[in-house]
Design a protein with these regions (language model features):
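Short aromatic/hydrophobic contact patches that present stacked aromatics
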Residues: 3, 107, 140-142
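Conserved GNAT acetyl-CoA-binding A-motif
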Residues: 131-142
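Conserved acetyl-CoA-binding loop-helix of GNAT-fold acetyltransferases
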Residues: 107-110, 116-133, 151-156
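Ligand-binding pocket scaffold of soluble enzyme catalytic domains
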Residues: 128, 146, 161
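GNAT-family acyltransferases
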Residues: 1-105, 130, 166-177
Length: 177
């Protein structure tokens, strides 16, 4: 049964396979995934680089962790079944101006070969108690106006549409279940 885990080096091979799928599909130019691919993609195959990447992801929730200027603390969770990487989800602990307009508190991605199986819906639902534990009573979740599957995922989680900005639909989702 799929579940969330903290990023873990044991998922290395499946993670690499998933990243190949995302590359073949073409990652969104504004996505965290693309940013990470540009930074690590050519070297993720090296165990020491992947271990450093995993260590960095697991340090991101800490306020004192060095990060790119303007970036906020975040909790990254990997959605796996056994040692198969199915997707990832990031919970940003607070909003900066960019996240308030376009990015939101929660971003998620399901690897292309695992889509249309209910994983995104399960991931978003399972992330809400985690967001609540971080101290977020409600979270902003956004999607492209043209991304009907993601819109349905957000609405299934109880998302209430606030408005549309910059090609994004902006929903608020309560974390109290």
């Amino acid at each position: 049964m799929p579940r969330f885990i903290a990023p873990d080096i044991r998922i290395h091979a499946s993670f690499l396979d998933a990243m190949k799928e995302f590359v073949e599909e073409g990652a969104d130019e504004r996505s965290l995934l693309l940013h990470e691919m540009e930074e690590f993609g050519g070297t993720w195959h090296r165990p020491e680089v992947f271990a450093a990447y995993v260590e960095r992801l697991n340090a991101e929730p800490l306020e004192e962790t060095p990060r790119i200027e303007g970036w906020v603390p975040s909790t990254t969770l990997w959605y796996v079944e056994g040692e198969t990487f199915l997707g990832r989800l990031a919970i940003r602990h607070r909003l900066n101006p960019f996240l308030r307009e376009l990015g939101g508190h929660i971003g998620y991605a399901v690897r292309p070969t695992a889509r249309r199986q209910g994983h995104a819906t399960a991931m978003l639902a399972a992330s809400l108690p985690v967001a609540r534990a971080i101290g977020l009573a409600s979270v902003l979740v956004t999607c492209d106006t043209t991304n009907v599957p993601s819109r349905k995922v957000i609405e299934a989680a109880g998302g209430v549409l606030e408005d549309q900005r910059g090609g994004k639909l902006r929903y608020w989702v309560g974390t109290d279940g």
